Design a protein with these regions (language model features):
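Conserved catalytic-core motifs of GNAT/GCN5-like acyltransferases
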Residues: 83, 95-116
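Conserved GNAT acetyl-CoA-binding A-motif
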Residues: 64, 71-86
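A short, internal acetyl-CoA/4′-phosphopantetheine-binding micro-motif in the GNAT/acyltransferase core
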Residues: 46-56
Length: 122
């Protein structure tokens, strides 16, 4: 029986996704001027699920670490960021693992867009 799974797809982190354009500009300043763009390649975590009997055991943290390492070592996707539309009750988990909210929390939405900058690991 599987204890966890995840799915990935190509995505982007773009200027349009940020309600506060100053947040995108702050992110942009961390990137070399010659390489700045209006959108950046990303890999989206479409699903990340852990069997209830294995929650709070480090399996989720391990899978995120595996995903992050894979993006840096393999470089098959050519991405700079990992994105996720986190369920509201999972935001804390992603924040503990270095993800940042794209916009301010919106209680009317079931999910919140978040991202992780892979440059932190280099």
């Amino acid at each position: 029986t599987p204890i966890a799974y995840f799915s990935l797809s190509n995505d982007n982190l773009s200027y349009e996704k940020f309600q506060q354009k100053t947040s995108f500009n702050r992110l942009n300043r961390a990137i070399d001027n010659a390489k700045r763009m209006k959108q950046y390649p990303a890999v989206k975590i479409g699903r990340l699920a852990i069997d209830e009997s294995h929650r709070n055991t480090g399996v989720g943290r391990y899978l995120l670490s595996l995903i992050k390492s894979s993006m840096i070592i393999n470089q098959k996707s050519g991405c700079r960021f990992i994105t996720v539309d986190a369920y509201n009750d999972a935001i804390g988990f992603y924040e503990k693992n270095g993800f940042v909210m794209v916009n301010a929390f919106n209680p009317e939405k079931r999910t919140q867009p978040m991202f992780f900058d892979l440059a932190q690991l280099l």
